[in-house]
Swiss-Prot record:
Residue ranges with Polar residues bias: 1-11, 180-202, 481-496
Lineage: Eukaryota, Fungi, Dikarya, Ascomycota, Saccharomycotina
Zinc finger intervals, C2H2-type: 225-247
Protein known as: Transcriptional regulator STP2
Lineage top rank: taxon: Eukaryota
PROSITE patterns registered for this protein in UniProt: ZINC_FINGER_C2H2_1, ZINC_FINGER_C2H2_2
Listed InterPro entries: Transcr_Reg_ZincFinger, Znf_C2H2_sf, Znf_C2H2_type
PTM remark: Proteolytically cleaved: activated by the amino acid-induced proteolytic removal of an N-terminal inhibitory domain.
Gene Ontology molecular function terms on file: DNA-binding transcription factor activity; DNA-binding transcription factor activity, RNA polymerase II-specific; RNA polymerase II cis-regulatory region sequence-specific DNA binding; zinc ion binding
Amino acid sequence: MSVAITSNNNKQPQPQPQPHLKVVNNNSTFNLYTWLRSVFQYCISLIISYTSNWLLVNNDNNNNNININYKSNNNDNNNASTSLQPKISNVKAESMKIFPDLQKSNFTTYYTTEKPLHQDVLKPVICSTGITSRILPYTNEKGELEWKFTEVQGKELDEFKMHPQQQQQQQEVKQELSPAESNESNESLAKDSSTTPASISDSPSHSETESTVSSTIIANSNQIFKCPSCDAEFRVRGYLTRHMKKHSTKKAYTCPFHDKSIYVDENNITHKCHSSGGFSRRDTYKTHLKSRHFNYAKPIKSAERSKVPGQCAMCGEHFNSAEIWCEIHVEGGECKFLPMGFKGKSRIKNRLKKQIQKNKMIDPELVPFASKVLEEVEQERQKKKNYRTTGTGSESSIQSQESESSINSTPLSMQISAPVPMPVSIQQQHQHQHQHHHHVQNQHQQHVNQQQSIATPASIYSSSASSTSSYESTHSPYTPQSSRSPLSHMYNPQQPPYFNQIAQAHQQDGQKNQVKDDYDDEYCLDVDQLNTTFVNETVANYLQIHDFHSMNQYQPGQQQQQQQQQQQQQQQRQHQQQQPSMYF
């Protein structure tokens, strides 16, 4: 390495020295500074590489040691927490990094099984919020303090308690049972009695309440129900109601052949199918019909009668079984010897009708009887059709009659709307027309009154004023005609001519004003007076009377005006005649 090297005249750039090798050129001179610098860089690079490798190896060893210790400590459940804490703290102190490695999380989730529910949780607890309810503390078996509702005996509810006399009356009412009541067991009564406030115990525990309820049920189960008509006794209330139907005079079922089955033999002994012919139950009624009024082909036991054919004892018709005979022939009302108006309750026949109406499959046993039921169904359909056709026709005829009667009965003033009041200038222009109209109306009214009297508004006004003065003395003068006595509607008396009616109405204005002055509020109307027809009638009558007054008032003024006009016309004519004579 200690060799002298000469350089050429043309100098070239020297390459950078590498850390591991030293390049020596023949043309370069020896430089100590560059050599030392390269050696120093090479040493530093070696130191850095060795230290990095050493650190990586130590980290891997530490991680393996931590995992081994963690697994061993998990097996020991009691010493797990104490053994892990110091080791982990030492590892953290030795290998602290600025950027830690991504590893498994230090948080672990422990799943614990759910505890089973206690049996006492499923039991109901008495809870009350009434007047006498109290919430009191008590200590349980574990010594813990708990709170529960209890009923404390007090005098708050004494006002609502029943006296002994009322309790006896209530018990007597309960014992009086009607035959129509349904069968109810004694257990339901025990349940009702157990739910009363008196049966709830004052203790907070649930076992004591169960014992009290069971004791009340046992006490009520020993109760006996006696029949008031005989000495029969029953433990179930429903049996008593069924028994009491025997003592009732009116039975639910009666034998239809009872009257025809009575006969007297040679020894003057009367024979009947039954003592009274009445039955309180359907099953006993049907057994009576099958045993007394159905003839079997051969003598047979009562248990085997349902499948044996036979004949009707009254009409002799043959049937495959007594059940079909009873349901269709007797209850269906097909036997000829049934009394008039007999209505049975045939369940089989009703089922057949429903099957035929809904077009369903018919039972093969009931096919022979389906023809009769089909005829009845068709008859019912025809009746419904006839009723609909006649009903629509009758309704239309009734509506037409009502419309005609309403047209004939309506007054003349109601067919035309009520006149509207006009100013005085327009009235003066149409006075002549009003006079002509009233004159024609007067002649027409006289002609109509000879044939029949029509209830015009003016006639109603005058008739009410003349014939019901006594009624108005006790009632309001504004009451309409419809609210008066119904006897006034039974006849329609003849009325005087139209103008005479108006004159009579004006003569009686003084009497009406005296009655109206007795009332403070003249505008107080009844409910019946709010009807539109009554308002139209009153307005029309008022306007007609007003027109008549205006005509009578303006007649003298019109006569004077006509006389003045005639005088002026005569003066003008005379003046015209005098003018040509002056020119001549």
